[in-house]
């Protein structure tokens, strides 16, 4: 009887490990594939002991007893993160100001010296003027790291040329009388349409003032609105995330990653614009929020919409796609059913995982605990050094997005791991170490298809 039980357990482990090896091979994860195959070989040796060396069966019995204990420990539920379940307000410890869009490095690089907007901003932030002056001259996404490889750089330019065209039609006024429909039904339709158009994750929230910019300058405009009068923003936001290709992202910091960034920003501008005009046709206001037109900060808005949590790398981390997403949204006054913020153990996992910080080529990601910044607890990135590296390589890097353990493909195997991290007391503590063992601690660029290969 013991022999049969041990045989079944060991055979099951062999099959699981071979499945892991196959999945790792498909993901171009050679380190994980070899680790899985070596583990499978160990279990083949155990099978030999079980079947042909009865005097040594105490070894597999002890091994599976320890394995069973580990499984039981993994099944101990963790305590919920109450701050995460509150949303962005759960991390407020002071009186946070509303965000100024000029605090975003890529936005303020477009400030023109001698204008009132320039003088007013650097009067308040003199420490940023000189470093911004240097970086402003270098600000580019031109594929320097790949020698400006034209096919890929042209992909980047082509995709980023789309959002400016969408900007002019971002605001959609009601075209008809409001359609008589319940909030429940309208929410189902809006989410379904957004999914159909290409959004992989969709959520709804009330627009929190902490997400609304005070000083706006959309990326493609030439003038700022400086401390202007308060505008009445629609109360609801439909927030959408499109998926960044796993293959493209794992080529970071090379040009395929930047090409995919442009592609998903273009997709987001299209989806949000279509959704804005759908709300318009339903008799309500729709304002598309995308890389060509921002009124709000999208990551915290997505947190409010129950789409994920903000990780150590500063990105929104979603339950199924991790950091591999780009965000867009629509502000509307159409009554919708709001989602609640979620807790997927990101904070606890990131506290035990330094992978993004350790591999960041510009050391821009903190290795410390969350600290207070503008009245909220957060992992504050060094945006200036991050941007300087972008300028150096001529892409948007994305190594931190790619190496994040949450960013693995949405497969059954990784789904089980995500479920355990979300529910287990032990998993967020030990799985960062397991990820290092299986996938390695250091960043390694993965191969890309021939049509994306920058190496002539």
Question: For each of these PLM feature ranges, what is it?
Answer:
Residues 153-179, 311, 316-333, 452-453:
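Amphipathic repeat-derived elements
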